[in-house]
Amino acid sequence: MTTSVIVAGARTPIGKLMGSLKDFSASELGAIAIKGALEKANVPASLVEYVIMGQVLTAGAGQMPARQAAVAAGIGWDVPALTINKMCLSGIDAIALADQLIRAREFDVVVAGGQESMTKAPHLLMNSRSGYKYGDVTVLDHMAYDGLHDVFTDQPMGALTEQRNDVDMFTRSEQDEYAAASHQKAAAAWKDGVFADEVIPVNIPQRTGDPLQFTEDEGIRANTTAAALAGLKPAFRGDGTITAGSASQISDGAAAVVVMNQEKAQELGLTWLAEIGAHGVVAGPDSTLQSQPANAINKALDREGISVDQLDVVEINEAFAAVALASIRELGLNPQIVNVNGGAIAVGHPLGMSGTRITLHAALQLARRGSGVGVAALCGAGGQGDALILRAG
C-alpha cells in the first residue's frame, strides 16, 4: 500500500493582530512558508505536482489565494492549486487531502499548508449592491462574522464554549493555570532553540535602510502567571470563566509541508520527518468545540489500530484552554505529552494555518525522538474535529 511522508516543512513566525506581519497578505505569507518548506526538504519547485493551502478569511484576498502563494513561491504555472476552507481545520485538512491524493496515486509530490492574515480581513457592507433607501447601515467584520461567530447559535464561539463549560465544569483557575503554562512552555522552547527547525525569518521592508528580520512569535509572554491571568475580566459572560488570557490569540502567519509518496522520497534519496497514518474526521452532535479533538483522535486511533497509551507526542490546538483540558480529560492523556512546547494560547491561532503548524511541530518532535507515534488534532467551527496519526520516519 502506498504510504505518504512529511519530508519537511516550515512556518513563519506568528504575528499579533496589527503586529509585525500586518502589511503582508495571507498569500504572501503562504509563499514564504512554501519556499521555506521546499528549501528544508531539498526539493526543487519543479517537482511539485499540486498545492493545497487552507485559508478561512478570503474576502478581499483576490482570486485563488493558494495559487497566488504557489506562483509567488516559484512553483510553475502548470501546477494546479486548491484553496480550502474548513475553518480552523483547514491547515490539517490540506495535509490529509494531500495524503489521500498520494495514496490514490494521483500525485507523488504535494505541498500542503495554511495561511491567514486576520489583520487584513476587511469589513463587509452587506446588501450594498441592491442599495439602501433609508436609515443606518451595519458594516460587518469579516474576521468576526466569517471566522469567529458560530452561525448555528448566532453567538461568538467563545460564548458557545462558555456555555459548554457549564457542563464540563472547568474552573477559572484550571483554565488560567493551563494558559499560563502554555506561555511558559513556549517561551522556554524558544529559549532552548526548539522552534529553530521550523520557523523561517520574514524580511519586513522599512522606509529606509535594510529590511527588519521578524524571527520569533510575538504573542508569547514569558512572565505570564496564573495569578496575573486571574485579574482579567471574563470575555463572554459576566459570570464566565473564559478570558482573553485563556483563549487563543488573533494572529497572522503561514505554514507549509512537503508531502511525498514514500517510494518517491526513497528514489530521490530523501529522509523524512514522519509517515502519515490514519485520519480521524468527526462532527456533532452540535456546534460546540470541546469534545471534537478527543473524538477525532479516538477515531484516528481506532483506524490505526492502536490505543491512546501508545501515543508519545500529542499536539492539540488551543482554541481555548477549555478545549485542551477537555481533550486531556476525555482521552485520559498524560498532560506531560500534550503541547509540550506551548500552543495557540501563547503563539497565536491564524485560522487557516494552525492545523499545519501543529502537524509540522508534532512531526519534528517525532523526528528528534527517532521513534514513536504522535497525533495532531483540532476542533473547528460548526462542531467538527480532525486528527492525523503520525509515525516517526
From Swiss-Prot:
Q: Which domain of life is it from?
A: Bacteria
Q: Which UniProt keywords apply?
A: Acyltransferase, Transferase
Q: What is one cellular component GO term in this UniProt entry?
A: extracellular region
Keyword ATP-binding assigned to the entry: answer is: no
Pro-peptide residues, renumbered to this chain, are 2
Record carries keyword Acyltransferase: yes
Entry protein name: Probable acetyl-CoA acetyltransferase
Q: Which organism is it from?
A: Mycobacterium tuberculosis (strain ATCC 25618 / H37Rv)
